[in-house]
Amino acid sequence: MAFDPASLTYDARGLVPAIAQDHATGEVLMMAWMNAEAVARTLETGRVTYWSRSRQSFWVKGETSGHIQRLVELRIDCDRDCLLLLIEQVGPACHTHRRSCFYTAVREGAEQVFLDPMG
C-alpha cells in the first residue's frame, strides 16, 4: 500500500510530532514538528525536514550547521498522530551542541545535566 502523508492525523495547526532516534543505537535525539509537506520532502530527499513553528518555514536539519539527519526509516504510531524517524545523525542533534536534546534528568527531585556539549 502506498503511503500518503495526508493519511496522518495532524493537530489543529496541521502538525504532527516527530521523534528522531538513532537507528543504530536506539538513542532518542530530539523531537520536532512536521506538516504533510515536510513529511513528503523528507521521504523524497532522505534528508529530514521539519516545520519550524517559530520561523513558520521548513527546516532541513543540518542545512546551516552541517549536523544533518539522514532518514533510514519512518514509522507511524498506532493512532497515526506521531512519527518515529529512525535516522543517521551527523554531529550533535541539539542546538546546544549535545548529541541529544534530552540531556537533563530529574533524579531524586532535582534536575541533573548528564550530557556535555560535543567538542
From Swiss-Prot:
Residue positions binding Zn(2+): C78, C94, C101
GO molecular function term, any single one: magnesium ion binding
Catalytic activity from the UniProt record: 1-(5-phospho-beta-D-ribosyl)-5'-AMP + H2O = 1-(5-phospho-beta-D-ribosyl)-5-[(5-phospho-beta-D-ribosylamino)methylideneamino]imidazole-4-carboxamide
Required co-factors: Mg(2+); Zn(2+)
SUPFAM superfamilies: HisI-like
GO terms (BP aspect): L-histidine biosynthetic process
Keyword Protein transport: no
Main location: cytoplasm
Entry note: cofactor: Binds 1 Mg(2+) ion per subunit. Binds 1 zinc ion per subunit.
Pathway annotation from the record: Amino-acid biosynthesis; L-histidine biosynthesis; L-histidine from 5-phospho-alpha-D-ribose 1-diphosphate: step 3/9
Keywords: Amino-acid biosynthesis, Cytoplasm, Histidine biosynthesis, Hydrolase, Magnesium, Metal-binding, Zinc
Cellular compartment(s): Cytoplasm
Family as reported in the entry's similarity comment: Belongs to the PRA-CH family.
Protein name (database record): Phosphoribosyl-AMP cyclohydrolase
Species assigned in the record: Cereibacter sphaeroides (strain ATCC 17025 / ATH 2.4.3)
Taxonomic lineage from the root: Bacteria, Pseudomonadati, Pseudomonadota, Alphaproteobacteria, Rhodobacterales
Gene expressing this chain: hisI
